[in-house]
Amino acid sequence: MSNHLSGSEIRQRFLDFFAARNHKILPSASLVPEDPTVLLTIAGMLPFKPIFLGQKTPEFPRATTSQKCIRTNDIENVGRTARHHTFFEMLGNFSFGDYFKEQAIAWAWELSTEVFNLPPERLVVSVFKEDEEAFAIWRDKIGIPAHRIQKMGEEDNFWVSGPTGPCGPCSEIYYDFHPELGDKTIDLEDDSRFIEFYNLVFMQYNRDADGNLTPLANKNIDTGMGLERMAQILQKVANNYETDLIFPIVAEAARLAAIDYQKADEKTKVSLKVIGDHVRSVVHMIADGISASNTDRGYVLRRLIRRVVRHGRLIGIEGQFITKVAEVAIALSESVYGNVRERETVIKAELEREEARFLETLERGEKLLESILEKEKSQISGVDAFTLYDTYGFPLELTQEIAEEQGLSVDTAGFEQEMKKQQQRSKAAHETIDLTVQGSLDKLAEHIHPTEFLGYTDLQATATVTAVLVAGKTVESAAAGTEVQVVLDRTPFYAESGGQIGDKGYLTGDNLLIRIEDVQKESGIFIHFGRIERGIVTTGDTINAQIDRSCRRRAQANHTATHLLQSALKKLVDGGISQAGSLVSFDRLRFDFNCPRPLTSSELQQVEEQINTWIAEAHDTQIAVMGLEEAKQKGAIAMFGEKYGSEVRVIDIPSVSMELCGGTHVKNTAEIGLFKIISETGIAAGIRRIEAVAGPAVLAYLNERDQVVRALCDRFKVKPLEIPDRITALQSELKGTQKQLEAVKQELALNKSDALLSQAESIGEFKLLVASLGDIDANALMAAAERLQQKLGEGAVILASTPAADKVSLVAAFSPRVIKDKGLQAGKFIGAIAKICAGGGGGRPNLAQAGGRDASKLSEALAKAKSQLTSSLQ
């Protein structure tokens, strides 16, 4: 057997083997799939799924790839078994109606035994129990003894794309780690002896709704070899984690924890392996444009980061560490996946932010969880699990994981009940979609052709009305005063897409005038939304469609400016920045992008100046339609998550910008005129937003600001350049006045509190005072409590106030002997009392404050405090 091939060498030998057999080597697709039915790329065949389903014609008959994949369905097994992962690379060779079963099997055997030099006597294969053809090929053509060919059922060895559609049997090759055990006890489920490393899928049937199988005219091959598994075999290590693909990450985590991996106990090794696996996942997910969030693939990323952080704490790593292990993962991958190095800054910033946030979450919730674990013997209640989730940010999966480590379960049904209660309490209005329009369009699409778009070259056109809708329902005709949706056979109107809003304009005919305010499209049908100002519109009418040229000019200026903005951000701020969304309207533009931090004033100024320089340089805009792969090879920027056909439209401003885009644009950057950034803000974790204006809108924006400046000058009797100094002076005056007011409030509170001394009760050797001081603020309340405790001597003071509607402030002040002799602590005590008022808090043993949101419970809270302290001080 070949000795110690590196993971990189294994990958390259696989690709080279099939390239020599006329397979086109394709780069790995993004982890963000084009298939909307899955969150992440989970298999090597996923990018080719449209071909296998007959939805797309292949550009070549054979392909080979090394596809990065992420699966989290077995996340609880990661680190606990030898070969479960969330991130892995799937090596594959594919045939689209070209070679089939016999050739696929022959090449798989040749690759395994002659390229990777696996001893034939150590290989076992499986076939679908009804696939006699595959069985015969393995036995008669390859020469494998029949007893080493295992027949398996449909669950294990039959691939389906869904309830109906292409499907077929598969055959798997296993490596035998212990051939000395003999052939009489072959059990492929025994993963301590056998590891499946190569799967061959023979797509040869179509399954109909009744379950009947019909042979396909074009049969396909889909194979997958696990890179990590082959590395384990060839590098002769105990598990995938100890291969050179992962172990350097594990070793770095062990170094940070001051642990010797080889001497570590099994529990510690599990944590180290989890870190090694998950860090690979999160690095590649962020590199492919995914940001942590509470939904969809963003939540998968957040969950994986949090598991890394928690397992780091379990093995004794203090503070933030994840970027250190991420650096190793980046170094291991950059030669094959260059975007991990290109987006290193973004990756580290996202990891640092999420790690810091989760460390705060852990610190807040771990004490409560510890107390829950102490009192519960078998199960954490749904109420407690929901409190951890809702109040402390603990995901249910994390609570379940920790509970499992302690031998407990979690009442998930109870958790879901609490979640539903909260949703009912906080139910808010949601935007709804008018499905009546969609339903009508679905029916229309069966009878009318997609609209022909003319708007790239024509601003007006003669067209035929193919449908009229009123209130979402198709009608034969509609009269003046009616809000309508009109469908045409051809149109110059741009329909909203790619962030650019739809055109405005008019539809005219014999005594007909329809003012169009918006245009949308669905399934290639353009819907013109408007109001009939004059006349009657009828299906079949010939009309003239004319867009508002002024609105179009402004929209295309803003759209081209958006392209310039992205280029400037990449050039001046971070080359790894990518678009996360946009809006191009007639009067302004909005651009959302991945960036872990706010832009500085200097950066914003540089970006603005660069864009205006490009505008002044009068660059021509070149538009071309080409193949998607050709466009990418030329460097055209594509938006993550956007679906593109085989033919794409490329907007090229030479030496400045090149993007895939279906929108409308200026012919020369000089047409934009001017560009002005209005604001830069954060809209989500790791997502920033720039709003800007271009062209005539810049003058309108500056005039508006000029009016504000003039008004301020009149108000303060100063010149424009003197306004900042005048505002600073006013702020200083206001701050001084507020300090004086606070001092007066505090003095009043102290005077009022002194009058309470006579209300103090004697409890044995101690004094106890529990009282409410009206609406004074928290700072004054704290000062009053501290002063009263000093005047009372040994004892306890509890003060409360309601400084605002439904807002409660509470303070506890305990003397030294109350703390020492009675074992009471102000922080813990007042925090518990505050829960009655739907709040919390804490502080030092002698002085602490808390707050609450339910003022109606204040009397109950004070009564509880008095009762408990009376009992404790006796």
Swiss-Prot record:
Zn(2+) binds at H559, H563, C661, H665. It is found in: Cytoplasm. Binds 1 zinc ion per subunit. GO terms for cellular component: cytosol. Coiled coil: none annotated. One of its GO terms (molecular function) is aminoacyl-tRNA deacylase activity. This is Alanine--tRNA ligase. It comes from Microcystis aeruginosa (strain NIES-843 / IAM M-2473). The gene is alaS.
